[in-house]
Amino acid sequence: MKFKKIEPEVFACTTSAARPFGCMELWAGNERAHRSLELAGLEADVIAVPSGAESGGDLSAVFSCSDSIARVVLADCVGHGYVASGVARHVHRLLHKFQDIRNTAGLLASLNDEFTLDSEESSDALRLTTVVTGTFDGGTGEFNFAYAAHPRMLLWRAREGKFLELGEGLENLPLGFVTGEMYSEQSVQLRPGDMILAFSDGATEVQSPGGDQLTPRGFLQLAESTLARLPGPVRLPDFSVALLEGVQSHKGNSELDDDVTLLTLRRSG
């Protein structure tokens, strides 16, 4: 499987370190790619496979912010291909406008209002978009997160050796549905070795040749079995590739019907 390296000029980056909670984009893209990054107290790995094209509707972004804080965003625009790719790029532009909002729920609220108003004014209607965003404090190990109708992230507890779903009760609307939506956030404490796995719904809705959907539960089990069979210490890039291969194996030999993006974080130390 080949991945295209995303050059820095593909997306314009904005440095805002002079402002409170100033964030600098380290990487963002909606193209086929595999990228690993080191942040304050955190490892990050992103692997993305658009369906039927080199770019699609999944946008992933990683920011380094002040106070040893890292921010990650994964957005999934309805559909795939050229139109969804344009929507993903629009979401990316909005991220730069609001990237310095510290609160994850506040970030989603601002994104949603602007996105919805833009959709109402645009001759080409923007599509509904799900988003998950999180901030990790490298000093305390606290991970704050919020959803806009996005699939639940998975939390790997290294000590217990199992994955858990994150965000019970966070039932918020996607971007573009209605202005004024109030989003909620939760937090979890990460210990060294703990991981966060965010993904687009293409990873859970993939169907076998017989028509059986992998489902969120099946994806969780696949993630656990994938991690169990990799020799330790597990490298995040190896885990991402092996998990993606597992998703593709469920699909069979045919191409994936939807964009698939996996964004994995692990607390270091």
Task: Please name every model-derived segment.
Residues 5, 132, 186-198, 203-269:
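C-terminal catalytic subdomain
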